[in-house]
């Protein structure tokens, strides 16, 4: 696949099975997505210990903090100190905006480029690619995918019918 595409993203399952280890060996970067929950932090610590024992360079593993800014009492700095690894990018926590984006069928990075989550996705893109997202033409950043407007209108009509059916 790497011969055919500039970037290949593989979402693996949380294990060190042979297929996962092979994927990790072939990867330029490993994006480890985590949240600020004690169980997730513990699992990340164990993962980083194994990765260290496998002699992967520390810079190959990039911590991505999902739901950044969530209230829960655990500070990012304390987690970084505990893990001895910096969080590379935090992804803003905004459930309502994400739900609206999914229901409308238009990615938030297209419909609301200045939204905190969109800016975080652009930072993540910049981290793993050579794409300078700061210089993207406004037309590229705000273009609507073909049919997305019609899909959003259709979704709105469908939701109206569903609401009416459940009244």
Model-inferred region functions:
Residues 38-41, 45, 73-76, 95, ...:
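Amphipathic alpha-helical transducer elements in NTP-driven molecular machines
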Residues 34-35, 61-73, 90-96, 111-113:
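G-domain G4 guanine-recognition motif of GTPases
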Residues 106-167:
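NTP-binding/hydrolysis catalytic cores, primarily Walker-type P-loop NTPases
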Residues 27-29, 56-61, 84-87:
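Short glycine-/polar-rich loops that comprise or flank the Walker A/P-loop
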Residues 20, 41-61:
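Conserved C-terminal guanine-recognition region of P-loop GTPase G domains, centered on the G4
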Residues 2-6, 16-38:
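Inter-motif core of Ras-like GTPase G domains
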Residues 67, 80-109, 121:
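Beta-strand-loop-alpha "switch" segments that mediate conformational coupling across diverse proteins
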């Amino acid at each position: 696949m790497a011969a055919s595409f500039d970037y290949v993203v593989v979402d693996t399952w949380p294990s060190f099975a042979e297929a996962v280890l092979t994927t990790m060996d072939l990867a330029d970067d490993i994006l480890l997505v985590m949240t600020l929950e004690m169980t997730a932090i513990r699992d990340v610590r164990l993962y980083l210990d194994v990765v260290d024992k496998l002699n992967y360079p520390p810079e190959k593993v990039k911590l991505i903090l999902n739901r950044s800014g969530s209230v829960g009492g655990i500070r990012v700095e304390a987690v970084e100190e505990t893990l001895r690894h910096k969080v590379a990018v935090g992804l803003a926590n905004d459930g309502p905006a994400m739900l609206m984006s999914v229901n409308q069928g238009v990615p938030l990075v297209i419909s609301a480029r200045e939204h905190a989550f969109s800016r975080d996705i652009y930072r993540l893109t910049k981290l793993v690619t050579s794409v300078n997202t700061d210089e993207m033409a406004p037309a590229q950043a705000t273009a609507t995918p073909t049919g997305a407007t019609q899909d959003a209108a259709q979704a709105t009509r469908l939701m109206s019918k569903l609401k009416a059916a459940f009244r």
